[in-house]
Amino acid sequence: MQGALSTPAELQRTFIATDDRHSLFYRELRAQLQTAGVQLVDSIAEATGTISILYDETDQRVLSVSARNVPTEYEVYYTVQYSIDGGGETLVEPQTLTLTRDYTYDPLLVLGKAREEEQLRAAVVKDLVRIVLKKISTL
């Protein structure tokens, strides 16, 4: 979607409201909006629109275990809730998105599996941001 985002006038100067400016989702959303030419501002007073990240959580859970009760498969999930306001009105009511990816786990390959988990989480974040950007382009 690089450079292909059509944004409404209400979002030409956008403030991203979040409690966690270090989350993977916030950083990826910010980077993709900047790439698309959206001017991001540091205060709500300067903004023509606001994207509010109301909830931002990621973790993993066990999907299956072996006969010895050792995890053999995990699921990485990422959940965000966001809303979009612009021009004094709500453009997008709060929406919750959850994406998951699963992977097999081998205790003998711990380092490789940790890297795989990071890559899956990054892919999930990119997909979540793509969904939000697509929603913005339909406004």
Task: Give the ranges of each region predicted by the language model.
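A generic secondary-structure signal marking the coil-to-beta-strand transition
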Residues: 12, 49-50
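Short alpha-helical linear motifs
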Residues: 30-35, 70, 118-122
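Sec/Tat-exported extracytoplasmic proteins
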Residues: 33-40, 84-88, 107, 131-139
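Short acidic low-complexity segments
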Residues: 38-49
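Surface-exposed short loop/turn segments
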Residues: 46, 52-96, 102-118
